[in-house]
UniProtKB/Swiss-Prot annotation:
Involved in the post-transcriptional modification of the uridine at the wobble position (U34) of tRNA(Lys), tRNA(Glu) and tRNA(Gln). Catalyzes the conversion of 2-thiouridine (S2U-RNA) to 2-selenouridine (Se2U-RNA). Acts in a two-step process involving geranylation of 2-thiouridine (S2U) to S-geranyl-2-thiouridine (geS2U) and subsequent selenation of the latter derivative to 2-selenouridine (Se2U) in the tRNA chain. SUPFAM superfamilies: Rhodanese/Cell cycle control phosphatase (SSF52821). It is an enzyme of class 2 (transferase). Residues 12-136 form the Rhodanese domain. This is tRNA 2-selenouridine synthase. The lineage of its organism: Bacteria, Pseudomonadati, Pseudomonadota, Gammaproteobacteria, Pseudomonadales. It comes from Ectopseudomonas mendocina (strain ymp) (Pseudomonas mendocina).
Length: 373
């Protein structure tokens, strides 16, 4: 039998398969990428055992647990664990603290299915603590540089061209602005933090010590940046990305209208998807009514409504440019002008996309290989 595991670094760097024996309610509050939830007890069973533990103590709770998970229920769960173990012979199982629940799963697999399967010592809690420390260590030991710039300048496009970029918005599944919600929703806060930590861990294991991030607010949608990282971002050097208003409008049109509509249609179908997309766009504008002011909001909402009607009728998106350009010029740009002035002392380079990409590659000492002739 393989040994029980305490090497959390190996688990995450090598994407070891893991099954989580916690109840679904625990799993959905926070888990690790790619892990499968195969609980010892469901939510109701866990609640009953927890109440029994508080009222009558550990032994009574253990006895109740064995009563609740018995017969056909027990056999079905053992079958699910055995299927996972056979499909993932290099995997592990865990519960919250690596204690009784994972030990019981381990024992039942052995006695009922003849399978020796190792567990993670310390369980979810220890692995979660390891990942929190991973992020703190990266912030303390690595070099970070931020990419800033007005809305629509293509900061995400810059990140996509860099080997050492960490895309925070991709981890949060959100574009980072008032209009940034995606059709597929955001991860739980803990899932966001765990995935980011694993990303940093893998990159550091590959030898990276310098990272490029987009200059973000503390909140990306409803995902909050880890505090040590956010605090560091208030001091990191900044590269400022520039582009023309026309190019920015086109980029916003593509991302927030064409691509977002396609996302909703892919998830919900043509008719329901377009309706959900239109509702999301209107909701995003309504959410900043107070900051826009009533008159400006009404003007932009009227243009947006006309644009959505035309898009629904014949697929044309040209009219969307009207509210997009007005929103940039009248709302977003003044905020970014203030931000740039307040961060001027940290800006070490400014330019358009290709110049910024080349500067950041030079800064990291990394250049893409030339294509073979």
């Amino acid at each position: 039998m393989r040994e029980n595991c305490t090497d959390y670094r190996d688990l995450f760097i090598n994407d070891r398969p893991m099954m989580d024996a916690r109840a679904p309610v625990e799993f959905h509050k926070g888990a690790f990428p790619g892990v499968i939830n195969l609980p010892l007890m469901n939510d109701i069973e866990r609640q009953k055992v927890g109440t029994c533990y508080k009222q009558h103590g550990q032994q009574a709770a253990i006895e109740l647990g064995h009563q609740l998970v018995s017969g056909r229920t027990k056999a079905e769960r053992i079958e699910a664990w055995a299927s996972f173990a056979k499909a993932n012979p290099d995997g592990y199982l865990y519960c919250f603290r690596g204690g009784l629940r994972s030990q019981i799963v381990q024992q039942w697999l052995k006695s009922e299915a003849g399978i020796d399967y190792p567990r993670v010592i310390g369980g979810y809690k220890a692995m979660r603590g390891f990942l929190l420390e991973t992020t703190e260590q990266a912030v303390a030991e690595c070099d970070f540089v931020l990419v800033g710039g007005m809305t629509g300048t293509g900061k995400t496009e810059v990140l996509a061209q860099l080997h050492n970029a960490v895309d925070l918005e991709a981890h949060a599944n959100h574009r980072g602005s008032s209009f940034g919600k995606r059709a597929s929703g955001q991860p739980a806060q803990i899932d966001f933090e765990n995935a980011l930590a694993i990303d940093l861990l893998k990159r550091r294991a590959a030898g990276q010590r310098q990272f490029v991030l987009e200059d973000e607010a503390r909140l990306i949608g409803r995902c909050s940046l880890p505090l040590p990282l956010y605090q560091g971002m208030q001091h990191y050097p900044l590269v400022w990305l520039e582009d023309s208003l026309g190019d920015r409008v086109e980029r916003i049109l593509q991302a927030y209208v064409v691509e977002l509509c396609a996302e909703f249609v892919a998830v919900e179908g043509a008719e329901a998807g377009f309706a959900a997309f239109a509702a999301r766009l209107r909701e995003s504008l309504a959410n900043i009514t107070r900051r826009l002011g009533g008159e400006r909001y009404q003007r932009l909402a009227a243009i947006m409504d006309q644009a959505l009607e035309e898009q629904a009728r014949d697929g044309q998106v040209d009219t969307h440019r009207g509210w997009i350009e007005a929103l940039l010029v009248e709302y977003y740009d003044p905020m970014y002008v203030f931000q740039r002035e307040s961060k001027a002392g940290r800006i070490e380079f400014a330019g358009e996309q290709q110049a910024v990409v080349e500067y950041l590659r030079q800064r990291s000492g990394h250049f893409p290989e030339a294509p073979a002739s």
